[in-house]
Amino acid sequence: MRTGAREAQLLAAPHVPAGLSQLGIVRPCDRLVAFADDFVDAFASGFDCCDVALVGSPSAEAFAAASEGFDASFDAEGPHLWWFVNSIGGFGLRVPDLRALGRAAREAHALFVVDNTVASAFGCDSQRLGAALSLEALDRICAGDAPRKLVAVSVARSQLKRHRVDAAAECAHALLEGCGLAKLELTANEAGVLDRGLDSLDVRMQAHFDRARALAEYLAANEMVRNVRYPGLSSHPDHAIATGILEHGFGPAVEFDLIERSSGELFDALPGEFRTSPAGGATTRLSAPSGKQGNTIRLFAGTDDPLVVASVLDNALRKLATL
């Protein structure tokens, strides 16, 4: 939801892949290349009409290899090649080099789409870095108070320096304009929640980011967990890239693995609000991206006191260790 975007639309959708599918701009003759190993089912069910290739790395080389042999075009008629990544996402909370991907996408005549949900527009200006189309689920923008799930879609400006036109952005604009999607009518309550969320966005997002850093540092020093993944830690494989891609910090999410315990066991040892609080709200929230039988935990920092959160986590982990 950048003010510098050419245009923006709102959709009612549970998440970004569903929103992209709902737009209807990815057509049966197209190829969609995506790095989204934590969202495989959404791509399998939402884009069964087209050729979907899921890559194992968010690198430009992996996307180029998966695009070989496809004759893509920036003409509105297509066929179109789509490249999809998260600014922060996938198992391990990977941070792709959006600049390199944006350049490579244009060389391959691919329409570069970025899911900016985790970082948000506050934490990553994906269109400045090369995205033709940016989508963002608005849970955190709305502070967890939205009555229904909303996704924002924005198209990059096609006018570049020295009067050059970005053919990818122009194509994305034409496709969005021609999709025939009716304008989403917000209720007065929804409009109020969105307006209040935008007014307080910068302060709240900075708080989310700062608390995530504090909790990541606590977890990295905790012997009861392992493999802490957070782009702000020097141990993260994309740390160097993240410093040039993300803004105001390294996002609100931290991922880690339990030692010989399952995610479900940790959830049982924690107060219920860590699981039931609204996504994007003030309370720190945990999820299990590999399922409750797996051992991976993904933490989304709220605006609550990180010392209290760390203490509750510590007590739960110690309880698990005695079982």
Can you describe what each PLM-predicted range is?
Residues 2-221:
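Conserved PLP-enzyme active-site core in the AAT-like
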Residues 220, 224-322:
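Conserved C-terminal alpha-helix-loop-beta "cap" of PLP-dependent enzymes
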